[in-house]
Amino acid sequence: MSMFLDTAKIQVKAGNGGDGMVAFRREKYVPNGGPWGGDGGRGGNVVFVVDEGLRTLMDFRYNRHFKAQSGEKGMTKGMHGRGAEDLIVRVPQGTTVRDAETGKVLTDLVENGQEFIVARGGRGGRGNIRFATPKNPAPEISENGEPGQERELLLELKVLADVGLVGFPSVGKSTLLSVITAAKPKIGAYHFTTIVPNLGMVRTHSGESFAVADLPGLIEGASQGVGLGTQFLRHIERTRVILHVIDMSASEGRDPYEDYLAINKELESYNLRLMERPQIIVANKMDMPDSAENLKIFKEKLAANYDEFAELPQIFPISSLTKQGLATLLDATAELLDKTPEFLLYDESEMEEEAYYGFDEEAPAFEISRDDDATWVLSGDKLEKLFSMTNFDRDEAVMKFARQLRGMGVDEALRDRGAKDGDLVRIGKFEFEFVD
């Protein structure tokens, strides 16, 4: 099980359209009374709505299936069936929605009240009024409702924080958060004390405020899933400014500069765009005996190995214990936030404008295969949609479906594959004989 409650896989099913109706008026001089069957109602959509009051995806652990209502059937007197209400599913602010099958990002839900249709309801089937023609003024034909879209979704929740605290385990991130905000993270002198992100609000002495996330501790190899790994890195993608906290006392026996390089290497390995974010170096534990000398060496190494054309990151010596240097650090952070834009999580070209619910234009209208029992099997989105909307209880509807298959080239394709008169052909669970 994931160490964070920030991912969930769910099933969504939009409502089917209501079936159209076959009905006739009873009027003198009107053939068979004339058609009077109405259309079915639209199936309900499944709609995600951002609720700023939600903080986790915990609810989706216990309720993984969401199904909207179907539209009502068409009625006599040409009346349409009632359309179904949309199913509203509330999600936390900061939820990214992916198609679980393709991994494609469908939407990034960041604004309170933002809505997105994740599954589109099927349209209602047409009643027999719609099929009346001069040649057939009293058609005994109607359509079934279109099936609602069904899909499996992967939800990811990323912490919505302006500033992210990163660094090796036990460098003092949780303590720093506790003294600059009202947050009360778990603090301990052992690695991975923080295994879920802690959030807090900072208010500077000048009245500016911003959100800070103390993110779970990172170790080398995190971008390959080591330790808390990619679960940690997923949470930092949204932050606009990174505070890189380093233990200048070297109390764990590590070189502060090597720590700095290792963390940045992991950030770059996971996603190059993470390194586009401005970074402030927080030299923590400056109240310890060796910290001042270690900071001097750190600055020398940083200057010696930094690109001569690049601007050196700001370094702020602080002590979370004595609160030394905190006010200066927070003012600089607020100033940097003011001039740093938000970073798009994904390229806009990767985002869908709305939920995909039609057919891929490049996909073939149908495919033909053959089972071990020699039955020809027809498949394909377009063909299966036509099949599902055909009312096989009505002879006219069956004949119309046969004409549609011929129009799509199914008969010719079966002949080309070697189908002979009397061979069985299957669509879904429905079988019929091929007539040459």
UniProtKB/Swiss-Prot annotation:
Main location: cytoplasm
Classification via CDD domains: Obg
GO biological process, one term: ribosome biogenesis
Pfam families: DUF1967, GTP1_OBG, MMR_HSR1
Domain Obg residue range list: 2-160
Gene3D superfamilies per the UniProt record, alphabetical: GTP-binding protein OBG, C-terminal domain, GTP1/OBG domain, P-loop containing nucleotide triphosphate hydrolases
Location of this chain's protein in the cell: Cytoplasm
Domain OBG-type G residues, every copy: 161-338
Binding site for Mg(2+): 174, 194
Regions annotated as coiled coil: none
Boundaries of every OCT domain copy: 358-436
Annotated keywords: Cytoplasm, GTP-binding, Hydrolase, Magnesium, Metal-binding, Nucleotide-binding
Record: residues binding GTP: 167-174, 192-196, 214-217, 284-287, 319-321
InterPro entries: G_OBG, GTP-bd, GTP-bd_Obg/CgtA, GTP-bd_prot_GTP1/OBG_C_sf, GTP1-OBG_CS, GTP1_OBG_dom, GTP1_OBG_dom_sf, OBG_GTPase
Similarity comment text for this entry: Belongs to the TRAFAC class OBG-HflX-like GTPase superfamily. OBG GTPase family.
Known role: An essential GTPase which binds GTP, GDP and possibly (p)ppGpp with moderate affinity, with high nucleotide exchange rates and a fairly low GTP hydrolysis rate. Plays a role in control of the cell cycle, stress response, ribosome biogenesis and in those bacteria that undergo differentiation, in morphogenesis control.
Protein name from the UniProt record: GTPase Obg
Underlying gene: obg
